[in-house]
UniProtKB/Swiss-Prot annotation:
UniProt keyword annotations, A-Z: Developmental protein, Differentiation, Oogenesis, RNA-binding, Translation regulation
Coiled coil: none
Compositionally biased spans, kind Basic and acidic residues: 251-262, 438-447
Positions of the RRM domain: 66-144
Record carries keyword Transmembrane helix: no
Annotated protein name in UniProt: DAZ protein 1
Family: Belongs to the RRM DAZ family.
UniProt tissue specificity: Germline specific. More strongly expressed during oogenesis than during spermatogenesis. During the larval stages, it is more abundant at the distal region than the proximal region of the gonad. In young adult hermaphrodites, it is expressed at a very low level in the distal mitotic region of the gonad, and begins to accumulate in the meiotic transition zone. Highly expressed in the proximal pachytene region. Not expressed in mature oocytes. Not expressed in the spermatheca. Weakly or not expressed in the germline of adult males.
Length: 499
């Protein structure tokens, strides 16, 4: 048996041996990884080769087209005949070619072909003032043609501080010479900077690129099949498509660049036909349910004169102007059934109450209870029967009060409404500001002549009789006896004379 010191020594050795093994394994793993620099480098690290030779292919070779010049800057409304007549002032013109858009509109530049190269060179040496056309200075330049197209299908452009080489998909191309040019119609930056951006890709190229992404890395062969980049000048947002667009003085908004459509892949849902079938079936079922509900509503409305009646559900929706709903029927003290209304009660289960739908009590006069003369609205006295009517009726004679549009112990002698206990006439208060006149003033007002200022004479005999005076001083006429009437007529027919 080991002593404690020896056991401690052995444990220390085993622990040190394990640490050495782990350090050796870590050292072997670190040897495969790149060493981390102790300090940051003072010079920038080049991510791509110098000159970007692997990304930007060499420009193709161009040749100068003899006897032909580039002309730009003329109005877009100019025709080929007008352009030919203008240049025939100097030399004979063999051919005129104007560049047009897809809709047939001129882009403001074209090509003029002369008989010889010397004639074309002489025209290029002329000043813009000598070539002025319609008060515009024309821009001239050489016409070039691309010799080799390499394996790159789309065109590209490369700009450096010394020159600009631009290619276009057409048969003609244009270039700005590196040496100072005598033409002052177009000015470009003195020291432009070169920026390389990947060009727009069409639908076929996007599909080809997605297929190439399956390879682990791009080989030089694959790089050759990729589209070449386009070049932008500093401060410009649109690519320089061609030298012709720049020399012609056309604004960027007028130049219509090529449109590339990019179609993103759409995921295909599983069992798409099944989903469409289920959706169509659900839609048809929903439409049929809606039509069935509309038909039921139309049938119920046509069967009754009231708003939105439904005889099959046991309740009716409240009228838009009535904040109550029917909750059932009840029997009053006279043994007659009535509809029971409550304030917005929920619908009851079918069959809980007898399905008896009727209008409120103030609408049942003309439809259900025409025999009762005082059930509902009384047009003679402009009064309502029931809780909304005159409550004094119930206080004066409770037995004759209408309860729920049915009379209780109502006698036949009150059918005409002459009894003050049945229907009371509404009291009319006098109008404010109305002047109360005396009977004499009223009589004077009636006897006035329609002519202003004139006054009719009343017979003096009528005022002398006591009955006439009595009628004058009183508002209501007095019924005379036969004797008084005969005496009054005798006095009027034979007046007394004063001697």
């Amino acid at each position: 048996m080991m002593s404690p010191p020896l056991r401690y020594q052995k444990d220390q050795q085993n622990q040190q041996h394990q640490q050495n093994q782990s350090q050796q394994a870590a050292h072997q793993m670190v040897s495969f990884m790149p060493q981390t620099p102790t300090s940051l480098p003072s010079t920038p690290i080049q991510l791509y080769p110098t000159g970007a030779a692997a990304l930007i292919p060499a420009p193709p070779t161009y040749e100068l087209i003899p006897n032909r010049i580039f002309v730009g800057g003329f109005p877009t409304s100019t025709t080929e005949t007008e352009l030919r007549e203008h240049f025939e002032k100097f030399f004979a013109v063999k051919d005129v070619k104007m560049v047009k858009s897809l809709d047939g509109q001129s882009k403001g530049y074209g090509f003029i072909t002369f008989e010889t190269e010397d004639q074309a060179e002489e025209i290029r040496k002329l000043t813009p003032k000598q070539l002025e056309f319609r008060s515009r200075k024309l821009n001239l330049g050489p016409a070039i043609r691309k010799i080799n197209s390499n394996s790159f299908q789309p065109s590209y452009a490369i700009a450096t501080p010394s020159q600009l080489v631009a290619a276009s998909p057409g048969p003609f191309s244009y270039a700005i010479p590196a040496s100072p040019s005598p033409y002052s119609g177009y000015s470009y930056p003195a020291s432009p900077q070169m920026f390389v951006y990947p060009p727009l890709r069409s639908q076929d190229q996007s599909r080809q690129q997605s297929e190439q992404q399956t390879t682990p890395q791009n080989s030089p062969t694959n790089l050759q099949h990729q589209q070449s980049p386009q070049v932008f000048f500093g401060g410009d947002q649109d690519p320089i498509r061609s030298y012709a667009s720049a020399v012609a003085g056309v604004e960027k908004s007028e130049v219509s660049p090529e449109k590339h459509e990019s179609v993103s892949p759409q995921p295909l849902l599983p069992n798409q036909n099944v989903l469409n079938t289920q959706y169509s079936q659900g839609q048809q079922q929903w439409n049929s349910n809606v039509q069935q509900q509309q038909q039921q509503q139309m049938d119920s409305n046509n069967g009754g004169p009231y708003y939105n009646e439904n005889y099959s559900q046991g309740y009716t929706r409240p009228h838009p102007y009535q904040q109550f709903a029917q909750s059932g029927v009840y029997m009053n003290s006279q043994g007659m059934y009535h509809s029971s209304y409550s304030y917005m009660t929920p619908p009851l289960a079918p069959g809980q109450y007898p399905q008896m739908m009727s209008a409120p009590y103030w609408q049942q006069q003309q439809q259900h209870h025409q025999s009762h003369a005082y059930a509902g609205y009384n047009p003679a006295y402009n009064n309502w029967v029931g809780p909304s009517g005159d409550m004094n009726q119930f206080k004066q004679n409770p037995s004759n009060y209408f309860y729920q549009n049915y009379p209780g112990n109502f006698s036949q002698q009150h059918t005409m409404g002459n009894n003050e206990n049945t229907f009371s006439l509404p009291l009319q208060a006098p109008r404010q500001g109305k002047k109360s006149r005396k009977p004499s003033e009223c009589q004077d007002k009636k006897t006035k002549s329609p002519i202003k200022g004139a006054r009719t004479e009343r017979p003096s005999s009528s005022a002398s009789t006591p009955d006439a005076k009595y009628q004058k001083n009183h508002r209501y006429p007095v019924h005379l006896s036969p004797l008084s009437a005969s005496l009054q007529s005798l006095a009027i027919s034979s007046p007394t004379k004063n001697n």
